[in-house]
Amino acid sequence: MMMKINNYELFLYLVMIAYSMVGCAGNSICINLNEKKIVSKEGDIVRFEIEENDTSYYFLLKGKVRHQKTVDLKDIYNNNRVDESFRFGKMNSFSLKPRSTYIFTNRTVYDATPASLKFYTDSVGNLHSLDNRICE
């Protein structure tokens, strides 16, 4: 028995095949503990937020079309291309504090669910992942 495929179904199948071949820019991220960086596995990082305790800090990176795939957590303002007009007040640097818990959220892609990554710093300042999404 042969199935009849109408034009709409054929178009849908072609779109799905093209979408799977090209891929999409998602918000999937992981953490590189040695280099203290957040790495985007899919797409670029443009907008992100870091939550520390009950305070959220929002960041926007410079660029028109392409941005960076990593965010250096050692000093976010000085080691990344942060948009100057998007700084918080007179804050010149943003560094991670020892013995603190953080949530990094990639909010770059509008139609994708924001991806969050939880990590903490120990007393020496080393990073540790709380949800085991570590880059290899």
Residue spans of the language-model regions?
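Signal that preferentially marks extracellular ectodomain short beta-strand elements
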Residues: 71-101
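Short acidic/polar inter-strand loop motif in beta-rich domains
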Residues: 107-115
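Sec-dependent bacterial lipoprotein signal peptides
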Residues: 1-24
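Short linear sequence elements within intrinsically disordered, low-complexity coil regions
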Residues: 18, 53, 64, 107, ...
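Extracellular recognition modules
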Residues: 103-105
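N-terminal, post-signal-peptide region of Sec/Tat-exported proteins
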Residues: 52-82
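N-terminal non-catalytic regions of secreted/periplasmic and cell-surface proteins
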Residues: 23-60, 114-136
